[in-house]
A protein has these predicted regions:
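Conserved active-site and SAM-binding loop architecture
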Residues: 1-145
């Protein structure tokens, strides 16, 4: 996601070494998207226009937010799905979250530079992971029956 995400597009123009990495990342993403397997779930932040074009303009199937799954934060995450249903929100806390100051609800956007910043920004929220596990496993069990 480092080279495909909308938040990183500005770095393409300041560091020319990122362009080949972006091409490689888009190629890898496209190969995953078109893999000959029965089910696919790819999670990635919102893509920039160059990456979207390189993967063939395929739009995500769903855009989710942590606040849809019980976390008082905003961080858009896209899902590309094959033979899996869109996730159903499990605990929407958007109204409560919107009462927080912007720098709290968009905490990840305001993180200062640090060695761990990338790791903090790429955290998978437990509520989202739980929804994926329970909802998609149930779908698989239903189709196996």
């Amino acid at each position: 996601c480092t080279y495909l995400t909308n938040s990183g597009v500005c770095h393409l123009h300041t560091d020319p070494k990122r362009w080949p990495k972006m091409f490689d990342g888009a190629d890898f993403f496209k190969r995953l998207l078109n893999a000959p397997v029965p089910r696919i779930a790819i999670e990635n932040p919102i893509m920039h226009g160059y990456a979207k074009k390189l993967i063939g303009g395929v739009q995500q199937d769903q855009l989710i937010q942590p606040y849809m799954f019980g976390h008082m934060e905003q961080k858009a995450t896209c899902l590309w799905l094959k033979n899996l249903p869109n996730l159903t929100p499990t605990n929407v806390v958007k109204d409560e979250m919107m009462l927080l100051p912007k720098n709290k609800r968009e905490r990840l956007h305001y993180l200062p530079p640090s060695p761990d910043r990338w790791k903090l920004r790429s955290t998978t929220y437990q509520g989202i992971a739980d929804a994926m596990a329970s909802q998609w496993v149930n779908k698989l069990l239903e189709s196996a029956a």
